[in-house]
Amino acid sequence: MAKFSKGQISIELILLMTAVLLAGILVSVNMTRFTFEGDILSDVREDAFQVFEISTDTPIIVYSLNFSNVKISPSTNLYNAWLQINDTGNDTYLWYYSDGTFKGLANTSDPDESITEENLVLLPHEGYASDIIFRSNVPTAMSWDSYEIDFNDIKKFEIIANDVENNPISYSLTHGDSPETSNQAYLNIKANEVTIIVTKANDKVFEVIANTTSGTIELLPYTETSP
């Protein structure tokens, strides 16, 4: 039977206790790291909020949007078209007529370009867009998940896709029940993850946001930022 002196026992005991303590610390660190990373990953929802340039504590809602049969009238001025569709195919469509004669949906990105038959697109027409701008007599209020906003003094809407590559705006334009020669068209929009910008009659521009604290839809002053 081996014999140990008191000094040997003390040193070996210290070494043994140190080894056990270090092993415990390593296990604790590994468990903490796993738990921490797991919590972070489970709580983060990608694109749940948009970072807004102005100072506000109000979360910006990522909307899923569905507009059906929004009535669009033609415009004589391409700079102020009642409908502008920026298609993902790099085409720009404007709802347009000239000199009192109905022309149609013009495929042009240049407001100074003269509209010819070659520029016109017959309805129905559908596609995917990065953003859509329209002026229309929309319903007096818009609701989203029990939130509601009065649009009485809104003169222009801009719907912008937040992720064009994966979630472009799906749109279609038809004459509805009207004849093909009608100067009215009806716009249908389906989209996920969009930003809604509105311009009031006084030309002030706002972003539509949902205030989850007060349970209302509000308008925040909008400042366009460079991409």
Curated annotation (Swiss-Prot):
One GO CC term, this protein: cell surface
Inactivation phenotype: Disruption of the gene does not change the piliation compared with the parent cells.
InterPro entries xref list: Class3_signal_pept_motif (IPR007166)
Keywords on record: Fimbrium, Secreted
Listed Pfam families: Class_IIIsignal (PF04021)
Subcellular location: Secreted; Cell surface; Fimbrium
Motif QXSXEXXXL location, chain numbering: 8-16
Superkingdom as given in the UniProt entry: Archaea
Location, primary (coarse class): secreted
Residues excised as propeptide: 1-7
Induction, as annotated: Expressed under standard laboratory conditions at 35 degrees Celsius.
Post-translational modification: The N-terminus is probably cleaved by the prepilin peptidase EppA, which recognizes the class III signal sequence.
Entry comment, domain topic: Contains an amino terminal motif QXSXEXXXL, which is part of a class III signal sequence.
Protein name: Probable minor pilin MMP0600
Native source organism of the sequence: Methanococcus maripaludis (strain DSM 14266 / JCM 13030 / NBRC 101832 / S2 / LL)
